[in-house]
Amino acid sequence: MTSIIFMGTPDFSAPILRMLHEEGYDIKAVVTQPDRPVGRKRILTPPPVKAAALELGLPIIQPEKLRGSEELQQILSLQPDIVITAAFGQILPKELLDAPSLGCINVHASLLPKYRGGAPIHQAIIDGEKETGVTIMYMAEKLDAGDIISQRAIPIELDDHTGRVFDKLSMVGRDLLKDTLPSIINRTNNRTVQDETQVTFASNISREQERIDWTNDATTLYNQVRGLHPWPVAYTTFEDGNFKVWWATIGKSKHDTIPGTVVAIAKDHFEVAAGNGTTLALYDVQPAGKKRMTAEEYLRGTGSKLQIGDQFK
């Protein structure tokens, strides 16, 4: 029986771990990030992969930093035939990459060589891509640069957001690995070198990328809002406070005013001027110091004094 060490952290990875267990693979250990404080009360919370591993009765290793750690030596001592990673969150050191006889395999949420890096789903939606997918690949020292074993594409629908695509790709990754792993174990799999001329990157989202620039047109802003939904969430500023925009659509109004200006107010939304005469219609918001609410709730309460001509920056 092929022995596996699985490495992953978020919800994306948990169905993949469950599949490996259901298929009867010998999972020597599950490696995941340490428990972290979550929410306003900062409650120490295990990552989803740890929760799944506990449910399945699998050994768990949680290194703060893998490179040079005791946990790394523990992993190496298990002598797995293959290491499988899926959104683990740390770069694997060379001594681990070289250890398994079948190599280290990664389940990556993009159609490589496009969108190497830690935020491929966010970036594909922000960029307005019509398609994304999952790549099963051999791992190399260079981030997401290893040879491609298999890929599976899905469309990005116009109303998709990062959370929805994240869930879709988790299932795609699970199924693609299930279909691909036997050929890897039997050493009959395909292996394609990535075309370096086609490489694009998707680094972790920065605070600046979260900020709405109202001079961009409404399509660009809509892609930004849905690419950052439900985390980390796009924001603007209003009345000297950060104002989160959880959901918005392309507005119907046209304008010739300064971008960021409120140009229309309806019962369940309001429209803000964007670039090139377009508008963004805000439906789900969070004013500074308040909870998330619908635009209708905002306009009845905190935002009841919002007027046409008010300025978001």
UniProtKB/Swiss-Prot annotation:
It catalyses: L-methionyl-tRNA(fMet) + (6R)-10-formyltetrahydrofolate = N-formyl-L-methionyl-tRNA(fMet) + (6S)-5,6,7,8-tetrahydrofolate + H(+). It is an enzyme of class 2 (transferase). Disulfide bonds: none annotated. CDD domains: FMT_core_Met-tRNA-FMT_N, Met_tRNA_FMT_C. InterPro entries: Fmt (IPR005794), Formyl_trans_C (IPR005793), Formyl_trans_C_sf (IPR037022), Formyl_transf_N (IPR002376), Formyl_transf_N_sf (IPR036477), Formyl_transferase-like_C_sf (IPR011034), GART_AS (IPR001555), Met-tRNA-FMT_C (IPR044135). Keywords: Protein biosynthesis, Transferase. Pfam families: Formyl_trans_C, Formyl_trans_N. Belongs to the Fmt family. Attaches a formyl group to the free amino group of methionyl-tRNA(fMet). The formyl group appears to play a dual role in the initiator identity of N-formylmethionyl-tRNA by promoting its recognition by IF2 and preventing the misappropriation of this tRNA by the elongation apparatus. This is Methionyl-tRNA formyltransferase. The gene is fmt.
